[in-house]
């Protein structure tokens, strides 16, 4: 499809909305390359995927996907034998884990018997790699750090490092808290050049043997490594080197393991991107309240209450637009500013959305065509003061359109023939429309030339239309009226604004009879339309009342049978109780008669006694009624009240009843959403006590964290004082094994902030630093992450 029409219809804004919902790099790629297509089968597949996504969004909240980066460059590096770093491996690991999670998710959907049209075929293409997935998961953390579980050797080395660091801290404590503590600038232990040191006052350097590794900015403090711990520091450095070597070995091993599966991994990442795209389409459909269009291969377009998707839903006016079945050309006449241009753009944009596999902003059962291409000449300006250059530009555009259209094209022409002499412009417009009709393309053209009103009546497969204007308010309603040509409202408007009737009457006399007759005909048509609309609304109201009455009667009829069954059950239970008492009495009588026969020789036969008892037993009625659908529904129905936990069956979501809206509906709180739900859509849920044992979480305190806070506040400090505190604080935080700290320096003149960041830039223990989020101080605080 030509890109000019996409720009004219602002198709890129729809894509921008989609991109706001995508969370993977490959999903963003899918959206960036999205364009309308003209193959009906492929369009239907895309729409089926969107439909599946909408169903999953409604029932499950969407397909579970994490944020995923573009791993294509990493896999290309592996092809040339490069070793990936931890961060790159972590990104690949996320793709592998997401693949497994998505496959499990769709397996669960299949067990739940959720019918999907297209996505199962897509998901079947995934290649899960459980062994490689687990290997990366157990070796690389999400931030790219190599885990202790990556290898036995690495775990042993890190255990040794921790033990050795403990020994060094213990030995250093004898300096910071012993007799020589008075020679220190501060009783702390810090790190310089990857070695543990203590801050010694310049004048007391002779009190300590060892090596000076650094000094403070003022030169008053020397950072010395005491002779007594030099051997421990040497051993520590050796273990650190061995740790790094083991990490590099693990990275190389994992990179080598990925090599044979790189194509499958890339294919999985691209499939995840497609599912992310489906999620985005579903969320866009939800945001726009869009529906699934029906594809009509014969290009019969029938949009029911179509809305422009880029206009505020609370302000946009919906219109019915139909073309291609009963007529192939619509001529929209009438004055400017009535909404003709928006109507053209609505038709075009809704059509390209459908041909892109997106849901459309129209009511359900709306039909769209499959056009080979869509062309438009739509200007942004509608001023009557158009000059020749504007007319020439429009004509050049229309000439190109006429060269390219075929019988499967849709053409949208705004203010056809404008910008030149009205008589010539109208003649050109008629000739252009005739040529488009000869080709067989569908066309919607707007114009304010009255001559084209006659055209709509004289040409086959052509119909007039107009934008409604409310003379009472002197405002356009933006409603499209198919079959009614537009008419000038100049006389009515002038009269309402106060122009003397004599002037208006004289103006009417100056009009030729043909124009006057045409306006009268249009007025009659509009009156007929309004009468038909009034009748339609009355019939619709009666139909609604009849539907409500039918529903009430059905409910009462159902309740009657339920009550009847209940009363019959009670009656039978009562009758059975009477019969049981009679049987007991009968047993006593039979026993007495049997005794009389044995004792007195009476002529009473045994079978007569048994038959008599059987007849009594036949009076017993079953209290359990036969199964019937009405009773089963009645048994399932439970009395609902405010505060009840319920299941909304159509959404598969639980909620709580807030209030009863009417006899048929309740207001239900589902999470942060309140919705009006019908009674038949609610199932009362039992409140289940959560007796699961509480999970106890064990916390481990960092070694030196008891005396070091995770935040340093420098506000109100002088520059030199602040920088000295930063130096001491960073060392203390490293000793306390903090992974991340925050330095609050305020905004002010920025001198301390700049000094802090220059210090962090030069410190080799700092992995990265960045400003805090806006809600946590913004550029008034810096978050520091250590290696």
Curated annotation (Swiss-Prot):
<keyword id="KW-0378">Hydrolase</keyword>
<keyword id="KW-0255">Endonuclease</keyword>
<keyword id="KW-0699">rRNA-binding</keyword>
<dbReference type="InterPro" id="IPR007696">
    <property type="entry name" value="DNA_mismatch_repair_MutS_core"/>
</dbReference>
<dbReference type="InterPro" id="IPR000432">
    <property type="entry name" value="DNA_mismatch_repair_MutS_C"/>
</dbReference>
<keyword id="KW-0540">Nuclease</keyword>
<dbReference type="GO" id="GO:0005524">
    <property type="term" value="F:ATP binding"/>
</dbReference>
<keyword id="KW-0694">RNA-binding</keyword>
<protein>
    <recommendedName>
        <fullName>Endonuclease MutS2</fullName>
        <ecNumber>3.1.-.-</ecNumber>
        <ecNumber>3.6.4.-</ecNumber>
    </recommendedName>
</protein>
<dbReference type="InterPro" id="IPR027417">
    <property type="entry name" value="P-loop_NTPase"/>
</dbReference>
<keyword id="KW-0067">ATP-binding</keyword>
<comment type="similarity">
    <text>Belongs to the DNA mismatch repair MutS family. MutS2 subfamily.</text>
</comment>
<comment type="subunit">
    <text>Homodimer. Binds to stalled ribosomes, contacting rRNA.</text>
</comment>
<dbReference type="InterPro" id="IPR036187">
    <property type="entry name" value="DNA_mismatch_repair_MutS_sf"/>
</dbReference>
<dbReference type="GO" id="GO:0006298">
    <property type="term" value="P:mismatch repair"/>
</dbReference>
<dbReference type="GO" id="GO:0019843">
    <property type="term" value="F:rRNA binding"/>
</dbReference>
<dbReference type="GO" id="GO:0140664">
    <property type="term" value="F:ATP-dependent DNA damage sensor activity"/>
</dbReference>
<feature type="binding site">
    <location>
        <begin position="334"/>
        <end position="341"/>
    </location>
    <ligand>
        <name>ATP</name>
    </ligand>
</feature>
<comment type="function">
    <text>Endonuclease that is involved in the suppression of homologous recombination and thus may have a key role in the control of bacterial genetic diversity.</text>
</comment>
<keyword id="KW-0238">DNA-binding</keyword>
<dbReference type="Pfam" id="PF01713">
    <property type="entry name" value="Smr"/>
</dbReference>
<dbReference type="InterPro" id="IPR005747">
    <property type="entry name" value="MutS2"/>
</dbReference>
<dbReference type="InterPro" id="IPR002625">
    <property type="entry name" value="Smr_dom"/>
</dbReference>
<dbReference type="Pfam" id="PF20297">
    <property type="entry name" value="MSSS"/>
</dbReference>
<comment type="function">
    <text>Acts as a ribosome collision sensor, splitting the ribosome into its 2 subunits. Detects stalled/collided 70S ribosomes which it binds and splits by an ATP-hydrolysis driven conformational change. Acts upstream of the ribosome quality control system (RQC), a ribosome-associated complex that mediates the extraction of incompletely synthesized nascent chains from stalled ribosomes and their subsequent degradation. Probably generates substrates for RQC.</text>
</comment>
<keyword id="KW-0547">Nucleotide-binding</keyword>
<dbReference type="InterPro" id="IPR046893">
    <property type="entry name" value="MSSS"/>
</dbReference>
<feature type="domain" description="Smr">
    <location>
        <begin position="712"/>
        <end position="787"/>
    </location>
</feature>
<dbReference type="GO" id="GO:0045910">
    <property type="term" value="P:negative regulation of DNA recombination"/>
</dbReference>
<dbReference type="GO" id="GO:0030983">
    <property type="term" value="F:mismatched DNA binding"/>
</dbReference>
<dbReference type="InterPro" id="IPR036063">
    <property type="entry name" value="Smr_dom_sf"/>
</dbReference>
<dbReference type="GO" id="GO:0043023">
    <property type="term" value="F:ribosomal large subunit binding"/>
</dbReference>
<dbReference type="InterPro" id="IPR045076">
    <property type="entry name" value="MutS"/>
</dbReference>
<dbReference type="Pfam" id="PF00488">
    <property type="entry name" value="MutS_V"/>
</dbReference>
<dbReference type="GO" id="GO:0016887">
    <property type="term" value="F:ATP hydrolysis activity"/>
</dbReference>
<dbReference type="GO" id="GO:0004519">
    <property type="term" value="F:endonuclease activity"/>
</dbReference>
<dbReference type="GO" id="GO:0072344">
    <property type="term" value="P:rescue of stalled ribosome"/>
</dbReference>
């Amino acid at each position: 499809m030509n890109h000019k029409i996409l720009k004219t219809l602002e198709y890129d804004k729809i894509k921008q909305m989609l991109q706001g919902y995508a969370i993977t790099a490959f999903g963003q790629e899918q959206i960036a390359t999205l364009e309308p297509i003209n193959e009906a089968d492929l369009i239907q597949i895309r729409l089926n995927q969107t439909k599946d996504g909408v169903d999953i969004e409604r029932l499950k909240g969407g397909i579970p996907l994490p944020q995923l980066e573009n791993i294509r460059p990493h896999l290309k590096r592996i092809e040339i034998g490069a070793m990936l770093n931890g961060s790159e491996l972590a990104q690949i690991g996320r793709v592998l884990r997401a693949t497994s999670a998505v496959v499990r998710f769709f397996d669960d959907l299949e067990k739940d018997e959720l019918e999907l049209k297209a996505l199962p075929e897509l998901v079947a293409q995934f290649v899960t790699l459980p062994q490689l997935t687990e290997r990366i998961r157990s070796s690389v953390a999400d931030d790219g750090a190599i885990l202790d579980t990556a290898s036995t050797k690495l775990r042993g080395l890190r255990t040794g490092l921790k033990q050795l660091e403990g020994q060094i801290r213990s030995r250093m404590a004898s300096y910071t808290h012993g007799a020589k503590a008075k020679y220190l600038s501060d009783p702390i232990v810090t790190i310089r050049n990857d070695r543990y040191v203590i801050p010694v006052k310049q004048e007391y350097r002779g009190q300590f043997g060892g090596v000076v590794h650094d000094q403070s900015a003022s030169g008053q403090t020397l950072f010395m490594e005491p002779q007594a711990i030099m051997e421990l520091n040497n051993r520590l450095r050796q273990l650190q080197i061995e740790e790094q070597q083991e990490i590099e070995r693990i990275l190389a091993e994992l990179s080598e393991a990925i090599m044979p599966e790189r194509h499958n991994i890339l294919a999985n990442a691209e499939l995840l991107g497609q599912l992310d795209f489906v999620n985005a389409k579903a969320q866009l459909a939800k945001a726009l309240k869009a529906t699934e269009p029906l594809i009509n291969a014969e290009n019969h377009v029938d949009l029911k209450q179509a809305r422009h998707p880029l206009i505020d839903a609370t302000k946009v006016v919906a219109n019915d637009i139909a073309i291609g079945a009963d007529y192939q050309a619509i001529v929209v006449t009438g004055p400017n500013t009535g909404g003709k241009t928006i109507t053209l753009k609505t038709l075009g944009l809704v059509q390209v959305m459908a041909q892109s596999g997106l849901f459309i902003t129209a009511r359900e059962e709306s039909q769209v065509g499959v056009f080979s291409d869509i062309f438009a000449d739509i200007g942004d300006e509608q001023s009557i003061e158009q000059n020749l250059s504007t007319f020439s530009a429009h004509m050049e555009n229309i000439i190109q359109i006429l060269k390219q259209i075929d019988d499967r094209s849709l053409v949208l022409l705004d203010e056809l023939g404008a910008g030149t002499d009205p008589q010539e412009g109208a003649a050109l417009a008629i000739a252009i429309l005739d040529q488009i009709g000869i080709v067989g393309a569908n066309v919607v053209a707007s114009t304010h030339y009255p001559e084209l009103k006659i055209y709509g009546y004289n040409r086959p497969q052509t119909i007039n239309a107009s934008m409604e204007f409310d003379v009472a308010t002197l405002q356009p309603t933006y409603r499209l009226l198919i079959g009614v040509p537009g008419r000038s409202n100049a006389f009515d408007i002038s009269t309402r604004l106060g122009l003397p009737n004599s002037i208006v009457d004289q103006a009417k006399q100056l009009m030729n009879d043909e124009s006057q007759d045409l306006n009268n005909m249009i007025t009659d048509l509009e009156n007929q339309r309004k009468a038909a609309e009034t009748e339609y609304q009355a019939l619709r109201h009666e139909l609604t009342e009849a539907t409500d009455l039918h529903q009430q009667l059905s409910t009462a009829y159902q309740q009657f049978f339920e009550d009847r069954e209940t009363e019959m059950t009670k009656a039978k239970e009562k009758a059975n109780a009477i019969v049981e008492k009679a049987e007991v009495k009968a047993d006593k009588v039979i026993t007495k008669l049997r005794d009389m026969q044995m004792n007195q020789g009476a002529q009473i036969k045994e079978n007569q006694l048994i038959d008599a008892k059987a007849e009594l037993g036949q009076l017993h009625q079953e209290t359990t009624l036969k199964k019937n659908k009405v009773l089963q529904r009645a048994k399932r129905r439970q009395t609902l009240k405010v505060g009840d936990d319920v299941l909304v069956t159509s959404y598969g979501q639980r909620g709580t009843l807030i209030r009863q809206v009417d006899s048929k509906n309740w207001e239900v709180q589902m999470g942060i959403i309140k919705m009006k739900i019908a009674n038949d859509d609610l199932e009362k849920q039992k409140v289940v006590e959560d007796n699961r044992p509480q999970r106890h979480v064990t916390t481990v305190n960092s070694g030196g964290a008891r005396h070091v806070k995770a935040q340093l506040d420098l506000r109100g400090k002088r520059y030199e004082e602040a920088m000295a505190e930063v130096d001491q604080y960073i060392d203390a935080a490293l000793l306390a094994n903090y992974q991340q700290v925050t330095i609050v320096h305020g905004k002010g003149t920025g001198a301390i902030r700049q000094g802090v960041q220059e210090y962090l830039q030069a410190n080799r223990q700092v992995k990265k630093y960045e400003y805090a989020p806006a809600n946590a101080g913004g550029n008034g605080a810096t978050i520091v992450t250590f290696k």
